[in-house]
């Protein structure tokens, strides 16, 4: 059972259907009601059913309670192997700092060495990560491997994600105010929240979510690939003209590289945002700009 999406918890109005975007509608125009402060709170609250509807302070405590339960109880219950809660906490903090990247075990080990008093060896890190996967705390995203016009080498490493962004904020001791004071960091956690929701929506459409990155550094945050071969390219941005322009450039560059003689062209290209007054389709290139507060499956 996955955490709830913003549509399931009632924060997204659901005016834009991800499934409908695969039909490439000519025009969309819907109002978004969520502000950046709302998004910061929802990242830290998470999609935990018991947190929905509670007063803000009590709702935020649910993620910390979950984090404590994972590190002190659940991590041992999964296979009966005793694991030190303090070690689990240190690893989860390192994982949180590298969420949304293709960080290797070696990278996580170096992070632990730089940020904590004692490092863990490779086998211990791998063992702990496997236990966290079994209790559905982390869920890495596989790489997408399309047919390209060029011989560009595609990175095949999985991308690191918790199943809910609030696990990462709890591990690092962050709250909504911390995110509002550091929008760059907030962008990484917002991406994780979007991935959480997209995974639920994709499963409802008989699809999966992938990540694309190649040797040149071209990267696409999410690719929704359906069983029938249709797919959509998605960039995640907090919002604002500059970031949206970056997203447009990325989506256009990747789309131009795809060899459409060997596979379908993307059914849609979308920039999923935290802010913005409306969901709409750009006339010049057909890219959809959709606030997360408007999206459903």
Could you describe each region identified by the protein language model?
Residues 274-297:
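Domain-level recognition of nuclease-like catalytic cores that cleave nucleotide substrates
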Residues 3-23:
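Conserved small helical "lid"/interfacial subdomain of P-loop NTPases
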Residues 240-251:
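Active-site-adjacent loop/helix micro-motif of nuclease/hydrolase catalytic cores
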Residues 265-274:
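Short, hydrophobic beta-strand segments that form beta-sheet elements in well-ordered domains
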Residues 52-230:
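Accessory nucleic acid-recognition modules appended to NTPase machines
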Residues 231-242:
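Active-site ExK catalytic segment of metal-dependent nucleases
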Residues 23-69:
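Amphipathic alpha-helical "lid/sensor" segments that cap RecA-like P-loop NTPase cores
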Residues 203-204, 252-265:
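Arginine/glycine-rich "motif VI" loop of SF2 helicases in the C-terminal RecA-like domain
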